[in-house]
């Protein structure tokens, strides 16, 4: 197959949702339809031995939430689909944000009983920054749901995106009979397929077919016809250009748990979602059709293999083709490296990649030299932009139970900070280690990973820090004066960047007024 054909058949997407809207179940069912796993293990919390394929870290297994981002690749409809699983738990916005910089489209999953929830709103704001095309799946139709028209109205008014229903539900809860495909004029009748059973779906042609009345009952058939008249009068028709621009979302209805409707949005994804898209660098735009290799690292994950203390850098291939043993330039450090053992992923199962094309995600073994945001090319000096680091909102001091393990603690924290799991600050005035996070759960993750991966018993406690800002100044003399007078509020982060840590917001505001020449940054590029 030629290079353009390989690139054009790739679809790279992520699933975004509020916690518990069914994202992990959908992830599994997508893999099931892509024949990537044989049995979809229902995700359980503590104590269950059936863990979802994409939740592999110890703490995730205990809590039944996907904390880290995994990558899964599977074939579907002559396409090769890369699914990036993002953490659904409300605490993990940074990792999720960075993952969304590596995809070309997203599937938004909504719990049809609850509608649009707060976490979905946040994630949609992120996709808005790059106008990412969005498909929508209204999930849990095997339960009692809100009125479907109401759900569409809510998506339109709250998320500011037009909805184009592709399928429409017939009943819900115990009376759920299936969905009607508006463009194809076909009804797909629901039969629950549990676990890994994909039922043969019976299809009824035509909305006026008496077979439809016989299958779902006169009342529901008539209700469907009435609702569709309303829908066709009130909602938008699918418009591909508006979808690609992130202005309109095709909407599908179904139940992931019942293995129903998942294939409908997969058909939509492979047919309509964009092929690998261009990406901005500091010098030019890189198109996916270019045959020279380039890619950027959007995530680093430690210990994917419990047997080895390894770290894997996840790289999105932007252009060209990766081949085993090829020489690439690691732009930030200006070194050429030979990559002979890149990985491809089926979550938890890693296999060595012989080749990968634009749109694919590959894993590079990392012994501490690769950082989030790093660019790799075949020689060209450029840096992909738009992968941010956020100033944390929550802070804790980390304390050792055994003071002799200070060295291991520091090593563990620096590695976790390079991975983007947490940010570490070392105050200039004392030996404290302060960690900053975007969500509370991250502190638990850090303590649990320090224990399992670095054999360090640590606890965290409150610390008098309200917020942090990275500080820079063009005038060296003024910067020195600022540093001298504010030493008690200054710290170095994991990458040795100078940071102002403020005990209160008032303190920060005063410092900014007092030193107008100093730049205080809330985010910085990786």
Swiss-Prot record:
CDD domains assigned: RF3, RF3_II, RF3_III
Top-rank taxon, per record: Bacteria
Alphabetical list of SUPFAM superfamilies matching this protein: EF-G C-terminal domain-like, P-loop containing nucleoside triphosphate hydrolases, Translation proteins
Pfam families named in the record: EF-G_D2, GTP_EFTU, RF3_C
Record-level GO BP terms: regulation of translational termination
Locations listed in the record: Cytoplasm
Occurrences of domain tr-type G (ranges): 8-277
InterPro entries assigned to the protein according to its UniProt record, in alphabetical order: EF-G-like_DII (IPR053905), EFG_III/V (IPR035647), G_TR_CS (IPR031157), P-loop_NTPase (IPR027417), PrfC (IPR004548), RF3_C (IPR032090), RF3_dom_3_sf (IPR038467), RF3_GTP-bd (IPR041732)
Protein role: Increases the formation of ribosomal termination complexes and stimulates activities of RF-1 and RF-2. It binds guanine nucleotides and has strong preference for UGA stop codons. It may interact directly with the ribosome. The stimulation of RF-1 and RF-2 is significantly reduced by GTP and GDP, but not by GMP.
Protein name (Swiss-Prot/TrEMBL): Peptide chain release factor 3
Organism: Actinobacillus pleuropneumoniae serotype 7 (strain AP76)
Annotated gene: prfC
